Swiss-Prot record:
Record key words, sorted: Cell membrane, Disulfide bond, Glycoprotein, Ion channel, Ion transport, Ligand-gated ion channel, Membrane, Postsynaptic cell membrane, Receptor, Signal, Synapse, Transmembrane, Transmembrane helix, Transport
Origin: domain of life: Eukaryota
Stated name of the protein: Acetylcholine receptor subunit alpha
Molecular function per GO: acetylcholine-gated monoatomic cation-selective channel activity; transmembrane signaling receptor activity
Keyword Acyltransferase listed: no
Any Pfam family matching the protein: Neur_chan_LBD
TM region(s), chain numbering: 231-255, 263-281, 297-316, 429-447
Compartment(s) where it occurs, according to its Swiss-Prot or TrEMBL record: Postsynaptic cell membrane; Cell membrane
Length: 457
């Protein structure tokens, strides 16, 4: 009993499908009996075919800043009425809608005007949905590669305003009129990009009159997309490493000059920065229309490192100066030894000694005590015989020479210590200056644009 019921139901379903297929086959054969796909679907040639166009954005595939091409995945919805494709559902078993190949019917030749690469027209001919009133809905998928003027001035904190201009290629506004389905594209199925976010999307209809035919309008629908770049990738991989290189450059001035590693560290930082820039150069748009923010910051970092090397050479040269080659100007002594240490509170820095030996150690006339060892002033006109003794006089001259040499060496050492002290003061000043320049330079490059984006919300 149950088996027979199942077989009966299957038979009824099969019969329904066969009848439905027969009705649809008969309907399609009747509709296309005398149909021409090259003739506009109007009863009077003076009538205008009204085509409704809607754009559904599915995915933002790629933004090529160099070639200024935006690749998108879209669905282009087109609707119109073909009076040749109407029928009475009662005559065909209640069939109200059918799907037919789009190649078999007349279609508006809607193309992407600002196409940059590939095909201008839609190449995927999917089936259309046709109802008994002659209303046709065609939603083919397409990959559009549209031209977009990429402005890289604020890269990577940039916004781009790109557009898609759609219109019929051969029909003017007097025979085919295209109308936007909505004043903005459909973003209900949009898949978010990891690099871009769409802030605004609008559509406008334009009437364009060309000089060849000033009375004939040509219609187009232009969709504008305002896209903002997500800068996190560039902040982590470019900006922060450059900032760290700048701080590392500043630490060169904290390294003691006597260690002999100042230039080694400076050159190492420069080489590391050069290799880093060679690696990340492909991430930056290679265009000459403008210098992007990130390019300015990388240039600032490079100049910053090179300037530190040049100044380090000057500091090392100052550190190793001696009185035999350089005499310290009075203004240098006054500024770097007397003034700046007091202003900057260098209390832990030991200043070089400036005591000068002003008294002569020996004079030409030496008072020698009496041979008996009793001190006392010599008589008037008396000269000690020891002074006139050649051996004693030679010994005195030797001692005098040694004393003068020691005095000269001491003064030379004091002068050298003064130059080292000046170099140390320069190091401390430059450490603070370079740290400050690093922060101010970073803020000067990026702060203006970040404030502008914050105000825009």
């Amino acid at each position: 009993m149950e088996l027979s019921t199942v077989l009966l139901l299957l038979g009824l379903c099969s019969a329904g499908l066969v009848l439905g297929s027969e009705h649809e086959t008969r309907l399609v054969a009747k509709l296309f009996e005398d149909y021409s796909s090259v003739v506009r679907p109007v009863e009077d040639h003076r009538e205008i075919v009204q085509v409704t166009v809607g754009l559904q954005l599915i995915q933002l595939i790629n933004v090529d800043e160099v070639n200024q091409i935006v690749t998108t995945n879209v669905r282009l919805k087109q609707q119109w009425v073909d009076y040749n494709l109407k029928w009475n559902p009662d005559d065909y078993g209640g069939v109200k809608k059918i799907h037919i190949p789009s190649e078999k019917i007349w279609r508006p030749d809607v193309v992407l005007y600002n196409n940059a690469d590939g095909d201008f027209a839609i190449v995927k001919f999917t089936k259309v949905l046709l109802d008994y009133t002659g209303h046709i809905t065609w939603t083919p998928p397409a990959i559009f590669k549209s031209y977009c003027e990429i402005i890289v001035t604020h890269f990577p904190f940039d916004e781009q305003n790109c557009s898609m201009k759609l219109g019929t290629w051969t029909y003017d506004g007097s025979v085919v009129a295209i109308n936007p389905e909505s004043d903005q594209p459909d973003l209900s199925n949009f898949m978010e990009s990891g690099e871009w976010v769409i802030k605004e999307a609008r559509g406008w209809k334009h009437w364009v009159f060309y000089s060849c035919c000033p009375t004939t309008p040509y219609l187009d629908i232009t969709y504008h997309f305002v896209m903002q770049r997500l800068p996190l990738y560039f902040i982590v991989n470019v900006i922060i490493p450059c900032l760290l290189f700048s701080f590392l450059t500043s630490l060169v001035f904290y390294l003691p000059t006597d260690s002999g590693e100042k230039m080694t560290l400076s050159i190492s930082v420069l080489l590391s920065l050069t290799v880093f820039l060679l690696v990340i150069v492909e991430l930056i748009p290679s265009t000459s229309s403008a210098v992007p923010l990130i390019g300015k910051y990388m240039l600032f970092t490079m100049v910053f490192v090179i300037a530190s090397i040049i100044i380090t050479v000057i500091v090392i040269n100052t550190h190793h100066r001696s009185p035999s080659t350089h005499i310290m100007p009075e203004w240098v002594r006054k500024v770097f030894i007397d003034t700046i240490p007091n202003i900057m509170f260098f209390s832990t820095m030991k200043r070089p000694s400036r005591d000068k030996q002003e008294k002569r150690i020996f004079t030409e006339d030496i008072d020698i005590s009496d041979i008996s060892g009793k001190p006392g002033p010599p008589p008037m006109g008396f000269h000690s015989p020891l002074i006139k003794h050649p051996e004693v006089k030679s010994a005195i001259e030797g001692v005098k020479y040694i004393a003068e040499t020691m005095k000269s060496d001491q003064e030379s050492n004091n002068a050298a210590e003064e130059w080292k002290y000046v170099a140390m003061v320069m190091d401390h000043i430059l450490l603070g200056v370079f740290m400050l320049v690093c922060l101010i330079g970073t803020l000067a490059v990026f702060a203006g644009r970040l404030i502008e984006l914050h105000q825009q919300g």
